[in-house]
Amino acid sequence: MDETLWQEIAWGRSEYALTVALRHTLLRAPLGLHFTKEALDAEKDSIHLAGFDPSGAVSACLVLRPSVTPSWIQAAPPEAVLDMPAYHLRQVAVRQDLQGLGWGRALMDYAHAWVLDKSPVRQVYLHARSSVVGFYEATGYKIAGEPFLEVGLEHRAMHRFLES
């Protein structure tokens, strides 16, 4: 992990295609889902962050979509104001052979540092598959609201206020 190149990548570039392939393999294909052109086009205005190993293979990636703090953050901390600029963190993927080795935590740390360094936004929220809620709690996210179904799987809404 010490030799990992963490970087923001541009939509549509070859590195972006590598992250789409990883996200498809881990998040979409197991559910029988595929990316549509429209879904990928909708990512043009998002921030794409990824880690690459020395060979250039993508190790981990995620997407930050500019948004506003959603109304479902009912038990939010006082600093979480509705309609405040926020990022919707989505499509977090870590290569299967690297899962459980700290890559997800390193990716989240990189994403949080990116937000703090490059943006005035401090609120980040996500929809976590129930199977990984514990991971997000360990990285500082709090559950908000009741479980719900998304892409046929139970999810939990979660949020975190980043402090510099």
Which residues does each PLM region occupy?
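Conserved acetyl-CoA-binding loop-helix of GNAT-fold acetyltransferases
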Residues: V94, G100-A113
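Helix-loop element at the rim of GNAT/NAT acetyltransferase active sites that forms part
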Residues: I9, A21-H34
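Conserved GNAT acetyl-CoA-binding A-motif
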Residues: M108, V115-A128
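Short hydrophobic/aromatic beta-strand element in the GNAT-like acyltransferase core
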Residues: L33-F35, S46-A50, C61, Q91, ...
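Conserved beta-strand in the GNAT
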Residues: A50, A57-S67, W72-E79, H88-A93
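Conserved catalytic-core motifs of GNAT/GCN5-like acyltransferases
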Residues: Y125-H127, E137, K142-A157
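A short beta-loop-alpha structural element at the N-terminal edge
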Residues: E3-T19
